[in-house]
Structure formats: structure tokens, C-alpha cells
């Protein structure tokens, strides 16, 4: 993923714009990607330091004018993202250093003019004890240092695909500095919406979803700390949401960003058609929700869990996207479930207002005790309920509540 400093932009008043990628620029990006990809493939088995040096030499050899150096660095970064490095045992490396340094200290103390300290001999002895070579011992001394990690594989995107997705990669980097994003999306396949909404929840973003007149949705996105004006702490999540948004048939984004060294507030807009950056699966459930699902499925009950999120729309009031639904085997009764556990009180009250406006679905909301919202606020609504939990979601308590809702 690109960082904000690698994006080539222009300012027009209070608007931030990307430099357009025309045919000439796209061909240039593809050529750079091909050059850097070739270097990466040739260095499989080399250290990260050796690869980085070779990539830097390759960049210098392109002899680009100053205005193009940022583009070169951006392509280099995207190619580097396709590299997989070994993850050495840090404890083993530290233990090896202690042993070799202890031996070296003892050897230097015992050395004399007639019998000087012999580093090579020390490494050979240590290697013999470990049934390896002196070269392997020396390489292992600092194997836990990033520069010494070895490139295991290169699985970067084809140069043409990297060039085709370059503008989207730049837009993703701009969103690292976003404080708020409004997206308009439209897709023919309901599964695209489900994957998008699940991705937003997985990223701990707070989507405000409304049905649009064209059959799509308008989505407002804030991070959980958006109440602190100007915070870009959740810019990474906003950036990571872009591929799921761009998978829709048509989409557009309007963002408020803080840009430059002075963090000047600017507006940023980008739009397009369906773009597949890479093959991806639907994101996994958050850990706390996955743990609950596992616990619930161990219960002896008549209910099964459907993990394909539904889109519950109350025209004129808003949209709710539960995390999952419980379905009773004997009669097909369905109760939706949404975890609002550690989000904001504002999000919880939005759901309460949606229910009070007449949401025509049975639904249970699980809310963290820390949000200070009482279960009684929905006592007079027979088709919806709040379940307040302290640390973990108790499967038996949820079962009791969905049984009551199903009976309503």
C-alpha cells in the first residue's frame, strides 16, 4: 500500500486532485513495474538489504527528472509489497549472539601475542557443535534484523495490472489522511454489497448507510474517534475500505482530508467502475464475534446461524446491516443480530431510533456495558432488544433473548 508522501497531487483551491494517469503515464508505470519486478525475482534468496540496494540502483538508473522521482518511488513501493520475507526465530538469534559473544570475550581474554584471537576458528568450533557451517553461524547472528531477512518469494502483480490500478492505489493513500468519507455505490449483485458492508464492520468503521434513489447506497464513514475533529487515526481503515468500495459496478467517494505538512483541510473526490485489485475472500468475523458463534453452535438448540449479512432498509429512516441471523429449524423464524460492542453510543442510538421508526424485522443488538446504554430502552418494542454484556457475549443469554423475540 502506498503512503501519502508517495502520491503525486495538485491543489485547486480547497480541492486535492490526483495527477491523471493518461496512456503515456500508464505505459511509463508499466515499464517501471516490469523493471522492478525483474529485480525482485532475481533477488529471491537474497537479504532485504541486498534487494533494497538493488531496487534503489534500478530506480537511479531510470534517470528520471525530479518531478518524476515520486512516481518512481511509488511504483517501487508497490512492487516491494509483493515480496515475502522469512520470519526468523528472534529468540534463537538472540541466544546464538549471546553464546558467540561469550566465547569471543573469553577467547580475547586468553589471547596472547603468540596465540592471537582467531575469529574464524571460533566460528568453526561453534558450527561443528551445531552440525552446520561457519557461514551459517555468521548469517544467523543477526538473522532477526529486518535488513538480514531473506526474500522467500515474489508474488507481485503483473506490470500491466499494477499500472491499471495505480490511480486507485494513489486514492487509497490519500485516504490515509482522511477524517471522513462519503461513498456512493451501486452494484447489480447483492453479494457485492454484503462483502462491502462486512468489510466496513471488520475495519471497525462506523458506516451510516442510506438507500439512494438509483437503487444503490450512500455510505458515510467515520472512525471510532471521529468525535475528535480532524483526527486521521483511522485513515488506514478508510484506505483499506477502498478496494471493497471500488468492487461495486459504479462508485464515487468524497472525502475530507488533512494534507501536507500543515495538515491543511482539503476536499478529495474520486470515482470509477468496478475494479478488482486482487482476488479476495469475504473478511473473517471479528474475533469476539467468531468466539460467540463458536460458543453458540455448541449449544443444544433449534437455531442455526446464517453469516450472510442482510440489508434491512426502512425507507425514509435508514439502513441497518446486521452481522448475522439466527434461523429456527422447526418454523424458519429469523432473528437478526448485530454486535455494537465497542463502537460509539451514537451508533447504538441510531439503531434504537431506527427500531422506533418502525423497522419491520426481529433484531437483537449486543452492546458493551462500557457504552452505558441500558437494555430497558427497547423494552416496549416487542421485535427488538438490547443485550448488554460485560466482557464476552454469553451464548445462553443470547439464546434466551432470541427465543423471546421469536415468540413476539
Question: Whereabouts are the PLM-identified features?
Answer:
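Electrostatic, structured charged patches in enzyme active sites and in nucleic-acid/phosphate-binding
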Residues: 1-408
Amino acid at each position: 500500500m502506498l503512503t501519502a508522501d508517495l502520491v503525486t497531487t495538485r491543489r485547486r483551491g480547497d480541492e486535492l486532485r490526483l495527477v491523471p494517469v493518461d496512456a503515456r503515464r500508464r505505459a511509463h508505470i508499466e515499464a517501471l513495474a516490469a523493471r522492478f519486478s525483474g529485480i525482485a525475482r532475481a533477488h529471491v534468496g537474497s537479504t532485504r538489504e541486498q534487494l533494497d540496494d538493488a531496487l534503489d540502483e534500478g530506480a537511479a538508473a531510470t534517470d528520471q527528472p525530479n518531478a518524476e522521482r515520486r512516481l518512481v518511488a511509488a511504483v517501487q513501493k508497490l512492487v516491494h509489497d509483493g515480496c515475502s520475507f522469512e520470519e526468523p526465530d528472534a529468540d534463537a538469534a538472540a541466544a546464538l549472539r549471546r553464546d558467540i559473544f561469550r566465547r569471543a570475550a573469553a577467547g580475547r581474554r586468553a589471547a596472547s601475542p603468540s596465540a592471537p584471537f582467531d575469529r574464524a576458528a571460533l566460528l568453526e568450533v561453534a558450527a561443528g557443535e551445531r552440525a552446520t557451517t561457519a557461514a551459517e553461524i555468521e548469517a544467523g547472528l543477526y538473522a532477526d534484523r529486518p535488513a538480514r531477512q531473506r526474500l522467500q518469494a515474489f508474488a507481485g502483480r503483473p506490470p500491466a495490472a499494477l499500472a491499471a490500478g495505480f490511480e486507485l492505489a494513489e486514492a487509497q493513500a490519500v485516504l490515509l489522511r482522511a477524517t471522513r468519507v462519503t461513498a456512493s455505490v451501486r452494484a447489480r449483485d447483492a453479494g457485492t454489497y454484503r462483502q462491502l458492508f462486512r468489510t466496513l464492520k471488520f475495519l471497525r468503521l462506523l458506516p451510516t448507510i442510506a438507500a439512494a434513489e438509483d437503487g444503490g447506497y450512500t455510505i458515510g464513514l467515520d472512525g471510532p474517534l471521529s468525535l475528535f475533529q480532524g483526527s486521521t487515526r483511522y485513515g488506514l481503515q478508510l484506505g483499506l475500505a477502498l478496494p471493497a468500495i471500488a468492487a461495486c459496478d459504479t462508485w464515487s467517494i468524497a472525502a475530507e482530508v488533512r494534507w501536507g505538512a500543515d495538515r491543511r483541510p482539503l476536499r478529495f473526490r474520486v470515482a470509477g467502475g468496478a475494479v478488482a485489485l486482487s482476488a479476495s475472500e469475504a473478511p473473517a468475523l471479528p474475533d469476539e464475534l467468531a468466539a460467540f458463534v463458536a460458543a453458540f453452535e455448541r449449544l443444544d438448540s433449534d437455531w442455526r446461524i446464517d453469516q450472510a449479512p442482510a440489508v434491512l432498509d426502512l425507507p425514509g429512516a435508514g439502513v441497518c446491516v446486521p452481522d448475522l441471523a439466527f434461523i429456527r429449524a422447526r418454523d424458519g423464524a429469523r432473528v437478526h443480530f448485530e454486535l455494537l460492542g465497542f463502537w460509539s453510543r451514537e451508533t447504538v442510538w441510531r439503531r434504537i431510533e431506527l427500531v422506533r421508526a418502525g423497522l419491520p424485522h426481529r433484531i437483537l443488538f449486543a452492546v458493551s456495558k462500557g457504552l452505558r446504554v441500558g437494555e430497558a430502552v427497547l423494552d416496549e418494542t416487542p421485535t427488538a432488544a438490547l443485550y448488554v454484556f460485560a466482557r464476552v457475549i454469553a451464548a445462553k443469554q443470547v439464546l434466551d433473548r432470541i427465543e423471546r423475540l421469536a415468540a413476539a
